[in-house]
Every structure is written in structure tokens, then in C-alpha cells.
């Protein structure tokens, strides 16, 4: 049985979050035929679809637990279909949150350029937002200056105030 928009709009947020974390579908419920009474529809299929869209605006990252809550907070009020708008939301958040400079290491295979996985760098500032690579930061390795995607960096000091925001951005970038 699929829930209608009336039920979905009245569904407690914690139930939706728990369902997302556990990978369950909160929009339906399986019942035996004898547990259901035939009734008249209270809405249309379109209204139900619209209710689900509204729920996703506040719960689309709930499946990630606490990390998802932080990501959702950054994206509150943002049309997630507009990729540049979401990148700009991250840029605003990171500009306010990060303390520059900070030390990081390069992650993953780097097929081009002078930086390699494991290189230690000093991140100086956010340079720009790119529609393909996301947040680009200015960094230094030794005396050389480079621009590099933030999604390919990890803050070295786990206790740094920069660690969690950069990790949250990386997780969002990988799952967008």
C-alpha cells in the first residue's frame, strides 16, 4: 500500500530519518488483504508525488545519519537539481567555517598534474567554484602554488575544526 499525501505530510520526521538510515521505504507499507479496508482516495497521485518531493527537501541526506544531517543543513533552501547553486551553498558554508591555512593530504589516484596521492599540502583559500570539479582551493606544496579540487583533499589533523566540514563536503561530492 502506498501512503497518500495526507499521511506523508503528517509522518514524524524521526520515522523518515530512521527509514532512510535503515534503507527502508517510508512511502509504502506491506499489509495483508484482511488488514486493509477499501476507502475513497483523499488525494491524487500528483499530490502524493509532490509531498514526497517536499519531504526530500529536508530528508534527502538522512540515509547518512549525523553526517547527512550536517550536509542537509548546508543545503537547506537550495534547489539540489541546480548543481551550481549547491556548489555556491557549499562555498558560502566553507568560507564561513574553515580556518585558513590548514594542512591536508591529497587523496586518490591523480592521473594528471604534479600532485600525487599522499602529498602533504597547505590549503590557503577557496579559489573558485567549477561546475565539474566543485570547490577549487589554492594550496601550496613547498614553494609551488596549485589550484586543486577540495573533494580530493583530507585534513591531516582529525581534531582540527576544518576536518569535519571538509569530510562532509567530500562525502556530499561523492554522493551528489
Which stretches of residues belong to each language-model region?
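Basic/aromatic-rich interaction segments and small domains that mediate binding to polyanionic partners
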Residues: 1-95, 100-168, 172-176
Amino acid at each position: 500500500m502506498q501512503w497518500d499525501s495526507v499521511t506523508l505530510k503528517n509522518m514524524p520526521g524521526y520515522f523518515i530519518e530512521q527509514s532512510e538510515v535503515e534503507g527502508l521505504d517510508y512511502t509504502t507499507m506491506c499489509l495483508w488483504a484482511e488488514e486493509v479496508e477499501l476507502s475513497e482516495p483523499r488525494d491524487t497521485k500528483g499530490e502524493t508525488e509532490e509531498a514526497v518531493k517536499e519531504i526530500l527537501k529536508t530528508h534527502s541526506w538522512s540515509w547518512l545519519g549525523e553526517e547527512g544531517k550536517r550536509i542537509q543543513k548546508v543545503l537547506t533552501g537550495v534547489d539540489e537539481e541546480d548543481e551550481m547553486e549547491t556548489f555556491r551553498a557549499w562555498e558560502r558554508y566553507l568560507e564561513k567555517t574553515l580556518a585558513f591555512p590548514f594542512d591536508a593530504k591529497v587523496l586518490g589516484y591523480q592521473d594528471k598534474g604534479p600532485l600525487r596521492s599522499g602529498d602533504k599540502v597547505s590549503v590557503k583559500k577557496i579559489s573558485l567554484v567549477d561546475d565539474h570539479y566543485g570547490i577549487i582551493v589554492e594550496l601550496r606544496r613547498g614553494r609551488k602554488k596549485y589550484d586543486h579540487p577540495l573533494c580530493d583533499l583530507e585534513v591531516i589533523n582529525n581534531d582540527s575544526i576544518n576536518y569535519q566540514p571538509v569530510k562532509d563536503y567530500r562525502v556530499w561530492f561523492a554522493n551528489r
